[in-house]
Regions:
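Short S/T/G/P-rich N-terminal loop/turn motif that feeds into the first structured element of a domain
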Residues: 1-57, 70, 97-149
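Short hydrophobic/aromatic beta-strand micro-patches
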Residues: 11, 62-64
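Conserved aromatic-histidine-acidic binding/catalytic patches
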Residues: 19, 62, 71-75
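Extended cationic-aromatic binding surfaces that line active-site or macromolecule-binding grooves
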Residues: 41, 64-65
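An amphipathic, aromatic/His-enriched active-site/gating alpha helix that lines ligand/cofactor pockets
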Residues: 68-97
Length: 149
């Protein structure tokens, strides 16, 4: 069995304790609680309970889902979509994908290095069954047949 890993990467405009980030930080727990109660949500496998891996001005938010469709509903409908509309208040553009989707064996918790490999692959190769996006998605079957370039 396979599950969908979603890694969201963001470059913050300021440190998490800066007043500019206050609304974002204040809403993290609510958004995470909504994710946990959403159909298809499996887990948020990170070292910190709030689901964020923080490295300087970069944030990595991981979540595991049963399907692309379940994640897509959570992401683009409801309260989370309102936060997405405000993302430019808190996050800067940067070169590279701001998220990646990929299929992983159920129960496997990806490391930061594994996620980085998928992000780099998406940036260099475009969407493939190894690393893809909502707009260019692939099935587990396609992933199993895919050979890395």
């Amino acid at each position: 069995m396979y599950h969908l890993t979603h890694a969201n990467i963001a470059k913050m405009r300021a440190q998490l304790d800066d007043p500019l980030m206050a609304d974002f930080v204040m809403n993290v727990d609510e958004i995470d609680a909504l994710a946990r109660s959403s159909p298809g949500f499996i887990t948020q496998p990170t070292p910190r309970d709030e689901g964020l891996i923080y490295n300087g001005k970069m944030l990595l938010n991981l979540s595991i889902w049963e399907s692309v469709e379940d994640l897509e509903i959570f992401t683009y409908q409801g309260v989370h979509s309102l936060m997405l509309e405000r993302r430019r208040e808190w996050f800067e553009s940067y070169d590279g994908p701001n998220y990646v989707l990929y299929w992983e064996i159920a129960g496997h918790i990806p490391s930061e290095a594994e996620v980085q490999q998928r992000v780099e692959y998406l940036a260099n190769q475009g969407p493939t069954p190894f690393a893809f996006t909502f707009d260019n998605r692939f099935t587990v079957g396609e992933m199993l047949e895919y050979r890395l370039e």
